[in-house]
């Protein structure tokens, strides 16, 4: 029997635990290293694995109309430890999947500790494993220790490891009103269609600034210690520095002409820049913010053209440690400069507990397939939530503006147009219909992926209890939140 090298995993959060589980399912020996309790963080309370720090919610569990719910379902079918333990320790939360934090962490810690192929070690890792140390996955999370962060920065380049994320909201392009917005680059540079522009009159601008100043903000957590710096001020802080600061900053109208009113320059313009290769998502340039999420949606929908905006992601500024993954990682999460290393979890630039665990699941499978020489093992299709998230962080996102991203339907390829009824003109599904059709396609394609020959195919569940809905007759276009 071939003796394979063990897989070393650094970090006992959701991503590291999921990666370890997937590798052990494939029959590999795993060494899982967690620095707590020998070295703690400002945020963690205990020494259990997979400790949920900020919330006990894994968000919506609706697999047909919500992208994170779809990701839940895909992970369940792929034998996810995190989703199995979340189900076992579920607490009432309406349509969300929320868990008893302590029971959840204890159960995952116990499952890994009792697995005969998994060895849990406690201690800080202050350097990246060398080639001779064997294959490794770095899943050290947003609170990576200073020593390991320095080692990662040295290996990737100082500018490639961010310690704070400045997140601007991202809007689904198909929810923008182009009767009011238009495509144009400032001074018509580039191809002239690099930005979407939303104009504001003086009165609209004043009302917008008033709303920003009055909007309810989220405070930094004490342990974040995040300073503001001038290159990344929240939009509401800029407004506090003077009512015209935004009109001379990120909302300046110079070099732009409203084609519907070419003789009158808008008082201000909000620009949105393409955020993914598919062209389905656009980020609001310079709109990083600490406004509460409900306030963001309300206030930003005051902007002409964004009255019915659907947000793939809302903004924020908080402490984080993440790579410029589109530049640094290959499609199987390997560090291009050191391919014996993979990265997983929030450090790759995915945002959220579920997304972190999902990337851990994929990293564990990719590393295992490579160790076992399963060359035919392919990444999940881009039409799935797993594949869409993976594709975004490993190349689909713009490396120049990369910021952490939640899973959302905008990461999946657009649907094809089809007739509402026989003989009718084809159209692309919108709103809830788009989400349902995207989920249906994802689950069908996921089933095909899970059935490919692999170390996991005997235990995966390509066909789960949830029925895969058939394509529905297209009714009137409708909207829904992610």
Swiss-Prot record:
Q: Where is this region: Disordered?
A: 450-482
Chief location: cytoplasm
GO MF term (any one): tRNA (uracil(54)-C5)-methyltransferase activity, 5,10-methylenetetrahydrofolate-dependent
Q: List the disulfide bonds.
A: none
Q: Which cofactor does it need?
A: FAD
Which residues take part in binding FAD? Answer: 11-16
One GO BP annotation of this record: tRNA methylation
The terms describing its cellular component in GO are: cytosol
Where found?
A: Cytoplasm
Q: Which reaction does it catalyse?
A: uridine(54) in tRNA + (6R)-5,10-methylene-5,6,7,8-tetrahydrofolate + NADH + H(+) = 5-methyluridine(54) in tRNA + (6S)-5,6,7,8-tetrahydrofolate + NAD(+); uridine(54) in tRNA + (6R)-5,10-methylene-5,6,7,8-tetrahydrofolate + NADPH + H(+) = 5-methyluridine(54) in tRNA + (6S)-5,6,7,8-tetrahydrofolate + NADP(+)
EC primary class: transferase
Instruction: Name the EC number(s).
Output: 2.1.1.74
- Keywords, sorted A to Z: Cytoplasm, FAD, Flavoprotein, Methyltransferase, NAD, NADP, Transferase, tRNA processing
The record's similarity note reads: Belongs to the MnmG family. TrmFO subfamily.
- Matching HAMAP family: TrmFO
Task performed by this protein = Catalyzes the folate-dependent formation of 5-methyl-uridine at position 54 (M-5-U54) in all tRNAs.
Q: What name appears for this protein in its UniProt entry?
A: Methylenetetrahydrofolate--tRNA-(uracil-5-)-methyltransferase TrmFO
Source organism per UniProt: Rhodospirillum rubrum (strain ATCC 11170 / ATH 1.1.1 / DSM 467 / LMG 4362 / NCIMB 8255 / S1)
The protein's gene is named trmFO
